[in-house]
């Protein structure tokens, strides 16, 4: 889990638009962020394996 202070800092409006960065909407993780889903890879994998994200299935070949 991310620090609460860093999550609050990311939500504030930045002075320069370049400084904004994406965080996971569930856990607040800043790295491995999937823009399409708005969450990190860990939360994406967890929710998709449960079947809570529509249209996402595990691939097998």
From Swiss-Prot:
It holds the Pfam family Ribosomal_S14. The keyword RNA-binding applies. PROSITE patterns: RIBOSOMAL_S14 (PS00527). Its cofactor is Zn(2+). Zn(2+) binds at residues 24, 27, 40, 43. GO terms for cellular component: cytoplasm; small ribosomal subunit. Keywords: Metal-binding, Ribonucleoprotein, Ribosomal protein, RNA-binding, rRNA-binding, Zinc. It comes from the Bacteria. GO terms for molecular function: rRNA binding; structural constituent of ribosome; zinc ion binding. Gene3D superfamilies: 30s Ribosomal Protein S14, Chain N. InterPro entries: Ribosomal_uS14, Ribosomal_uS14_bact, Ribosomal_uS14_CS, Ribosomal_uS14_sf. Binds 1 zinc ion per subunit. The keyword NADP does not apply. One of its GO terms (biological process) is translation. Belongs to the universal ribosomal protein uS14 family. Zinc-binding uS14 subfamily. Binds 16S rRNA, required for the assembly of 30S particles and may also be responsible for determining the conformation of the 16S rRNA at the A site. Part of the 30S ribosomal subunit. Contacts proteins S3 and S10. NCBIfam families: PRK08061.1. This is Small ribosomal subunit protein uS14. It comes from Syntrophus aciditrophicus (strain SB). The gene is rpsZ.
């Amino acid at each position: 889990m991310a620090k609460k202070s860093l999550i609050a800092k990311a939500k504030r409006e930045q002075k320069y638009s370049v400084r904004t960065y994406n965080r996971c909407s569930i856990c607040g993780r800043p790295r491995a962020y999937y823009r399409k889903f708005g969450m990190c890879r860990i939360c994406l994998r967890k929710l998709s394996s449960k079947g809570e994200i529509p249209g996402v299935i595990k691939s097998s070949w």
